[in-house]
Amino acid sequence: MNAKDNETAEFETTADLAMIQRILPHRYPFLLVDKVIDMVRFKSALGIKNVTFNEPHFQGHFPGEPIMPGVMIVEALAQTSAVLVGHSMASADEDVSVYFMSIDNCKFRRKVVPGDVMSLRVETMRGKPGGKVWKFLGEAIVEDTVAAQAEFTAMISFPQAAA
């Protein structure tokens, strides 16, 4: 299959938990994307995270006033982008690993608490099929309000060819 065929090949625009677990190495308690409800190949994704009191970070952050740590919100955005790139590359016959490299312009605007449903919207700012460094813009949205936003960079690692 050549690159032109890959661009027009059938692309599944959603990802359930089983597909996410095939793409990401993360597992409980660190898998922070429940499903992806929309993807545009190599361009954007909309993930969902159902925030529950059963998550271990709420035991200490903060007793009596559980608030999702900002770093976990950013990680959920990064995982959503990894699902986007991993699924896009897999549909192009390339398995990849995606590693978080840097974060810029991060802002937290609203508390995220147990019971919230977080929409994780990520868009590719820079990156192309076969490229090793990608940059994303991410927003975590709760009840139509931006809870957090950030720009972040990821490195794509391609498996070594068999000798």
Curated annotation (Swiss-Prot):
Keyword rRNA processing attached: no
Primary site of residence: cytoplasm
GO molecular function: (3R)-hydroxyacyl-[acyl-carrier-protein] dehydratase activity
Catalytic activity: a (3R)-hydroxyacyl-[ACP] = a (2E)-enoyl-[ACP] + H2O
Gene Ontology biological-process entries: fatty acid biosynthetic process; lipid A biosynthetic process
Any one cellular-component term (Gene Ontology): membrane
Keywords of the record: Cytoplasm, Lipid A biosynthesis, Lipid biosynthesis, Lipid metabolism, Lyase
CDD domains: FabZ
List of catalytic residues: 61
Subcellular location: Cytoplasm
E.C. number: 4.2.1.59
Enzyme class: lyase
Pfam families assigned to the protein according to its UniProt record, in alphabetical order: FabA
The organism's place on the tree of life at top rank: Bacteria
Keyword Signal among record annotations: no
Function (record text): Involved in unsaturated fatty acids biosynthesis. Catalyzes the dehydration of short chain beta-hydroxyacyl-ACPs and long chain saturated and unsaturated beta-hydroxyacyl-ACPs.
Family affiliation: Belongs to the thioester dehydratase family. FabZ subfamily.
PANTHER family tied to this protein: 3-HYDROXYACYL-[ACYL-CARRIER-PROTEIN] DEHYDRATASE
NCBIfam families: fabZ, PRK00006.1
Entry protein name: 3-hydroxyacyl-[acyl-carrier-protein] dehydratase FabZ
Origin species: Dinoroseobacter shibae (strain DSM 16493 / NCIMB 14021 / DFL 12)
Gene, per the UniProt record: fabZ
